[in-house]
């Protein structure tokens, strides 16, 4: 799918053409703030008038910072020339575009002059100011440009006024963020970089969203549940004498975020009726509190972006501008992923090929993906995924390609993406990252089932192509959940430290001088955290290991992340942190599925599981006779791969690592594309007919999943690797400690993928040799202020009764004494 804007040309100025365009007023979108004052002249009519006026640039004078902008907007002399060039480019773009997407009449465009809202001395209200720069004024204190933590902008377009309230997205860059470029053939590294990337909302519009960068004008988008608006500055139309910078703004229908989508994280997949036809997405119910679910827990995808040489040349041969473009794109992607997938996209590095391309740039994305995968293995920076942005037009049906489910892998956690406008690249990058996360493309036949029919914008992973979509369908979200449940994405659970900016309360990262930081208010429990300080008596404010009523750590051994399968490891609280430990799984080679499978990369690999994943729940692996009979023949029906036009015979030792043979195949695979036809084969063996069918099923990255997966068992203590059957010991994995009897982890634990012992419930130590007493896993409930006990009540009652009796008896005795005195007092008058 190639989104609009994937071409390197500037966007068209439709909706403000100088001939034949309607310049009448337009109705504003629902939820936008109507412009005050008299009706505003439409931008196209204003442009015609201003272009006919004598040039005013020479008479303009630079004003001091903070001076008010004049009431009339000002356009410089180059505007008309550049608008003509842009119009020509628009015609060329629409005539020559290879995209399979039709430009919709619903898209509208205008020219606007945005302004930043500031406060003047002795004024209580904001006023518009034409300078859009958000750099803090006292830069000499810092070794890099520092931008304001908060900013507001006013944009008038389509008959409405929008006020955008922004907060610096301090979750975008990690503390280890580095920028790389080349000089004299050698890489040059620099820590940090300019950070001008904001998230926010439209003032007064509920559930609105904004993602903008302000490094060089305004780049990005905002939406109000009805329309999506894309904004960027017009190139070469602005100079220092200008009183305002023209921007082009596009309006198109937004994806409708239904209530079901907003509440999706609280629902179980098997509650949706359409999933009866998506059985492969279903998994067992998890006996764990949903608040500790692996999908609901926030995840962090650490991303590295690489820009090719043509992308660098496009940005005026400035690696700073090129890097800013990449950061702007990732800022947009992060705004999509964190809301719908509970996943933050954190940029750890940007590399720009300033001198030459480091790999061959071709129009064949499959070839380029394979070459880039080899290059990625030479990169030293840690990243969960590395993606290339290339200013090339692929001879391919889509604008990106990545390895399906490849995140966390140094060889497969990569992707290649076409360059274009920021919003278009953000959508392309969202799609290729989704492929890395096990999310499939959605053919049009699945669109009604996946709930992508509510809006013109469609969904991100639609195969037919959509324009500026920001919505993942139900199917996509369930596939991501399924990917996590199968053990994928283990690297996504290590929370990176906050970026290099100064400490700021409210960004969601606990920094120097802070005890807690709620970020968005919903991230903290109750009253545990106030102004980035823990409340009196509180030990924590958030996380699966923080008691949400007492604000105390859960006890050591309290389960905080359930194992999602036999090859996963349950994580337990440490007793001294509110956060759950990193997500680990068993080391490759452990037996699973009743000794029928082997753990590999956190998944239980069996031929049955692979057949069901490709062909549905009724499929199963064929009888061993099929593999021994067919894979030794070296034909289309059975082989160990292909060398040119020749099928490779499997040795008898490797027959279970060759062509995948299954029973009960469906007409079409659940993933990938069928290459050729299904090869039905059957034999009469030991008094019964056995099914030995197979097929070549190819993913977009050219991977043929019609062969037995790596990690699948092929004999006692043996597993497949690169279509060879190898001893597990030959994999040279790091080993965990052994006891004197040679038992791993003393026989009281399992070895993790980090070669550390995860001990059983009552054992501890690096080798699990120390007996640990049973822990209290159920912390006492918060009972509030302690009241009197039953014993104290009884004692108090008895004491009270004795005291009352004493008072009564004493009073009676005193009264009796007085009676006696009155009876025998000789001075007393009257009868007795």
Curated annotation (Swiss-Prot):
Q: Which residues form the propeptide?
A: 60-286
Name one process (GO BP) from the record. Answer: cellular response to leukemia inhibitory factor
Q: Which cysteines are joined by disulfide bonds?
A: 408-491, 450-475, 452-459, 560-580, 736-751, 745-757, 759-768
**Which CDD domains does this UniProt record tie to the protein?**
ZnMc_adamalysin_II_like
- Tissue expr: Highly expressed in the brain and weakly expressed in the heart. In the brain, expressed prominently in the amygdala, caudate nucleus, hypothalamus, thalamus, cerebral cortex and occipital pole.
List all Low complexity biased stretches. Answer: 28-37
Q: Where is this region: May bind the integrin receptor?
A: 563-568
Extracellular topological domain ranges are: 287-792
Subunit info here reads: Can bind to LGI1 and LGI4. Ligand for integrin alpha-V/beta-3.
Query: What is the protein's name according to its record?
Result: Disintegrin and metalloproteinase domain-containing protein 23
Show the taxonomic lineage: Eukaryota, Metazoa, Chordata, Craniata, Vertebrata
């Amino acid at each position: 799918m190639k989104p609009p804007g994937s071409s390197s040309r500037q966007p068209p100025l439709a909706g403000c053409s100088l001939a034949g365009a309607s310049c009448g007023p337009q109705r504003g979108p629902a939820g936008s703030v109507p412009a005050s004052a008299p009706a505003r002249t439409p931008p196209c009519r204003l442009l015609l008038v201003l272009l006919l006026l004598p040039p005013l640039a020479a008479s303009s004078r630079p004003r001091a910072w903070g001076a008010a902008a004049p009431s009339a907007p000002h356009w410089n002399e180059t505007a008309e020339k550049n608008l003509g060039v842009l119009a020509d480019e628009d015609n060329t773009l629409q005539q020559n575009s290879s995209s399979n997407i039709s430009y919709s009449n619903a898209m509208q465009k205008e020219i606007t002059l945005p302004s930043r809202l500031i406060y003047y001395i002795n004024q209580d209200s904001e006023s518009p100011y034409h300078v859009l720069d958000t750099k803090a004024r006292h830069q000499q204190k810092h070794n890099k440009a520092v931008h304001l933590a908060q900013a507001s902008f006013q944009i008038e377009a389509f008959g409405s006024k929008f006020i955008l309230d922004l907060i610096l997205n301090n979750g975008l860059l990690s503390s280890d963020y580095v920028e790389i470029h080349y000089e004299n053939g050698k890489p040059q590294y620099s820590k940090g970089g300019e950070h001008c990337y904001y998230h926010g909302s439209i003032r007064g519009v509920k559930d609105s969203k904004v993602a903008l960068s302000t490094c060089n004008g305004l780049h990005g988008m905002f939406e109000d549940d009805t329309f999506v608006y894309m904004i960027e500055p017009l190139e070469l139309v602005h100079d220092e004498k200008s009183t305002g910078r023209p921007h082009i703004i596009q309006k198109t229908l937004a994806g409708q975020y239904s209530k079901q989508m907003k509440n999706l994280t609280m629902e179980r997949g098997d509650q949706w009726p359409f999933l009866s036809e998506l059985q492969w997405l279903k998994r067992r119910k998890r006996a764990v509190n949903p608040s500790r679910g692996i999908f609901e827990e926030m995840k962090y995808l650490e991303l590295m972006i690489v820009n090719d040489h043509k992308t660098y040349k496009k940005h005026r041969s400035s690696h700073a501008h090129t890097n800013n473009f990449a950061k702007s794109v990732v800022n947009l992607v992060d705004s999509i992923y964190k809301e719908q997938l509970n996943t933050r996209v954190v940029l750890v590095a940007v590399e720009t090929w300033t001198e030459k391309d480091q790999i061959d740039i071709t129009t064949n994305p499959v070839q380029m993906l394979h070459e880039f995968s080899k290059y990625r293995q030479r990169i030293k920076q840690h990243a969960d995924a590395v993606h290339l942005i290339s200013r090339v037009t692929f001879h391919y049906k889509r604008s990106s390609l990545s390895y399906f489910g490849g995140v966390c892998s140094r060889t497969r956690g990569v992707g290649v993406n076409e360059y274009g406008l920021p919003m278009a690249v953000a959508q392309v990058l969202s799609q290729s990252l989704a492929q890395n996360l096990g999310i499939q493309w959605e053919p049009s036949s699945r669109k009604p089932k996946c709930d992508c029919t509510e809006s013109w914008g469609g969904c991100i992973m639609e195969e037919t192509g959509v324009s500026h979509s920001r919505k993942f369908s139900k199917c996509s979200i369930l596939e991501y959940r399924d990917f996590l449940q199968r053990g994928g994405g283990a690297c996504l659970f290590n929370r990176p430290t906050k970026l290099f900016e100064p400490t700021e309360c409210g960004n969601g990262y606990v920094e120097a001088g802070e005890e807690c930081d709620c970020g968005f208010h919903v991230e903290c429990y109750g009253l545990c955290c106030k102004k980035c300080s823990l409340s009196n008596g509180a030990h924590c404010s958030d996380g699966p290991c923080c008691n949400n009523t007492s604000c105390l750590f859960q006890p050591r051994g309290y389960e905080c992340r359930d194992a999602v399968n036999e090859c996963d490891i349950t994580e337990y609280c440490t007793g001294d942190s509110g956060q759950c430990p990193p997500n680990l799984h068993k080391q490759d080679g452990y037996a699973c599925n009743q000794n029928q499978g082997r753990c590999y990369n956190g998944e239980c690999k069996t031929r049955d599981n692979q057949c069901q994943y490709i062909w549905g729940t009724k499929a199963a692996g064929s009888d061993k006779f099929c593999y021994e009979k067919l894979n030794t023949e070296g034909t289309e029906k059975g082989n160990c791969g292909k060398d040119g036009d020749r099928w490779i015979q499997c040795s008898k030792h490797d027959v279970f690592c060759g062509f995948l043979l299954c029973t009960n195949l469906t007409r079409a695979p659940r993933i990938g594309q069928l290459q050729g036809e299904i090869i039905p084969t059957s034999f009469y063996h030991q008094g019964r007919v056995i099914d030995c069918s197979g097929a070549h099923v190819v993913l977009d990255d050219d991977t043929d999943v019609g062969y037995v997966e790596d990690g699948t068992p092929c004999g006692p203590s043996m597993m497949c690797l690169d279509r060879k059957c190898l001893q597990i010991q030959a994999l040279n994995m790091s080993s965990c400690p052994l006891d004197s009897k040679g038992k791993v982890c003393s026989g009281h634990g399992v070895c993790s993928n980090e070669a550390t012992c995860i001990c059983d419930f009552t054992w501890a130590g690096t080798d699990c040799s120390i007996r640990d007493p049973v822990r209290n896993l159920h912390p006492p409930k918060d009972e509030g202020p302690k009241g009197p006990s039953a014993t104290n009540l009884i004692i108090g009652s008895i004491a009270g009764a004795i005291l009352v009796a004493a008072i009564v008896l004493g009073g009676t005795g005193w009264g009796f004494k007085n009676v006696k005195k009155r009876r025998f007092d000789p001075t007393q008058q009257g009868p007795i």
